[in-house]
From Swiss-Prot:
PANTHER family: VOLTAGE-DEPENDENT CALCIUM CHANNEL GAMMA-1 SUBUNIT-RELATED, VOLTAGE-DEPENDENT CALCIUM CHANNEL GAMMA-6 SUBUNIT. Interacts with CACNA1C. Identified in a complex with the L-type calcium channel subunits CACNA1C, CACNA2D1 and either CACNB1 or CACNB2. The keyword Mitochondrion does not apply. The chain crosses the membrane at residues 43-63, 143-163, 169-189, 221-241. GO terms for cellular component: L-type voltage-gated calcium channel complex; plasma membrane; voltage-gated calcium channel complex. The gene is CACNG6. This is Voltage-dependent calcium channel gamma-6 subunit. One of its GO terms (molecular function) is calcium channel regulator activity. Its main location: membrane. Keywords: Calcium, Calcium channel, Calcium transport, Cell membrane, Ion channel, Ion transport, Membrane, Transmembrane, Transmembrane helix, Transport, Voltage-gated channel. Residues 15-25 have a biased composition (Basic residues). Detected in heart left ventricle. The lineage of its organism: Eukaryota, Metazoa, Chordata, Craniata, Vertebrata.
């Protein structure tokens, strides 16, 4: 009888300790399953924007510069550039669509020559088709984009802390970070547009003469626009999750609370 009481007390003690650990874990988490699911959905939306942002900043298809096709020549030249480097390509005119007056698109196969911009290291301006970049504007666009990525990474860290540690106060911080990163990316895109216009206007007087150019924005810049908008939308979702539930509960009452 004594041994049975001892084992019974030991079993009760273990069950009580396990229950306290579960209660402590739930109190530390602080998120109901429903609320945790909403946070994960908003984080998934922000992750899509983050992926597009990294893809946009890391690629060099922000803008394409196209020369006009020359009569009697089998090749023509085009270029595409981003925040970090520029690539010039020699394309076969037979591969260029017949309805185009200019060389391109830059995705066509051809002999490519890609170089990183030197104003990040030596401070020199780059020359593309006898035109000179304005390094101050290009540097500003790149720095703003990198700041946007850094703030975006901080926002991801805040939301991960919310899900793992239950620190709900970081929801608001994460929302601010994602919103700020989206704004910074959009500002970087606008600054880059000004750098393209400055490049087209800074024609070198040295021979040979600069060719006529047309330009068109490419898919990397489109990814940046989409990333900025999605990050802003994700920030709005996180901000909605920080609001108290009673205004929404009064507008959308639960079906179970009906008058009998």
């Amino acid at each position: 009888m004594m041994w049975s009481n001892f084992f019974l007390q030991e079993e009760n003690r273990r069950r009580g300790a396990a229950g306290r650990r579960r209660a402590h874990g739930q109190g530390r988490s602080g998120l109901t399953p429903e609320r945790e699911g909403k946070v994960k959905l908003a984080l998934l939306l922000a992750a899509v924007g983050a992926t597009l942002a990294v893809l946009s900043v890391g690629t060099e298809f922000w803008v394409e510069l196209n020369t006009y096709k020359a009569n009697g020549s089998a090749v023509c030249e085009a270029a595409h550039l981003g925040l970090w480097k520029a690539c010039t390509k020699r394309l076969w005119q037979a591969d260029v669509p017949v309805d185009r007056d200019t060389c391109g698109p830059a995705e066509l196969p051809g002999e490519a020559n890609c170089t990183y911009f030197k104003f990040f290291t030596t401070g020199e301006n780059a020359r593309i088709f006898q035109r000179t970049t304005k390094k101050e504007v290009n540097l500003a666009a790149a720095v703003i984009a990198v700041l946007g990525l850094a703030v975006m990474a901080l926002g991801c860290l805040c939301i991960i802390m919310v899900l793992s540690k239950g620190a709900e106060f970081l929801l608001r911080v994460g929302a601010v970070c994602f919103g700020l990163s989206g704004l910074l990316l959009l500002v970087s895109l606008e600054v880059f547009r000004h750098s393209v216009r400055a490049l087209l206007q800074r024609v070198s007087p040295e021979p040979p003469p600069a060719p006529r150019l047309t330009y068109e924005y490419s898919w990397s810049l489109g990814c940046g626009v989409g990333a900025g908008l999605i990050l802003l939308l994700g920030a709005g979702c996180f901000l909605l999750l920080t609001l108290p539930s009673w205004p929404w509960g009064s507008l959308c009452p639960k079906r179970g609370h009906r008058a009998t």
